Amino acid sequence: MLTAKQNMIECMKPGGQPDRYVNQYEAIKLLFHPFMFSSPAPQKGQLNVVNAWGVTNSFPDNVPGAFPVHTPDKIVVKDIEHWKDYVKAPSLDFPQEAWDQCKAMYDAVDGEKAFKAPFIAPGLFEQTHHLCEMVNALYYYVDYEDEMHDMIKYLTEWELKLAEGICDHLHPDMIFHHDDWGSHDSTFLSPSMFEDYFLDSYKQIYGYYKDHGVKYVVHHSDSYAATLVPDMIEMGIDVFQGCMKTNNVPELIKKYGDKISFMGVIENAFVDHEGWTDEECEKVVRETVADCGMHSFIPD
């Protein structure tokens, strides 16, 4: 019987022979890096916590996660034409003790059974709308192209320095990188605009990781992003995690399954609602695995 890690590798590789469905995150151990400890984040019930980028986040009791607060007084970028006056990248110079603390977590994982994957968030697109506010950011992508290109370059350089520290000190064999690129039914940017702003930056970031020991890139975007799959492949993404059913994953597997795998489809709306039943959950899971199969697909 294959280990969870071996089975996931067989699922992902062309012509692989997995001996069972990949069991969600069984083969992926999400781990920390020092920046996660140095940037304040709200715990459930906490409001208006300012992180290392100056973004204010809240985590009310009645929601599943924290989110940026964008009342006018809390938006970081007050004037996009002078964004450099507002956006100040936090330091990534950490003492060796901080790296050692994280390395102990990596060393505790059995690398034969699971991937060691640092969790990296937010991604480039998310960071722009965290700093600017979502509607503002989308407007700036259309009317302030030079400023947004420059901001993304600045964020990319910071991410590359983060990648350098992670690879030099922690030596992961996988990364789990977060950047939501769409809603339930559409991407936030057209494919051509997305490529113009993000393709080269992510090729640099994911290319750096793969040039320094990382074998697999899992990119999280719990959204529709089917039209961006060719770009994901070019960026070096191995798993599109969080893909909604609206992506028509069986068709994506037929078209791209020899180049990228897909993790998702079982949406919360189908199985996590008031009055849910075991029978209903089982029905959704069985239908999903029947539609998508065992190769290039991880039910989640």
Protein language model features and the residues they cover:
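N-terminal accessory/capping or targeting/presequence segment of soluble
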Residues: 16-58
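Short aromatic-enriched loop/helix-cap "lid" or pocket-rim segments at secondary-structure transitions
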Residues: 34-38, 61-65, 69-72, 130, ...
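A contiguous, low-structure linker/loop signature
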Residues: 47-98, 108-117
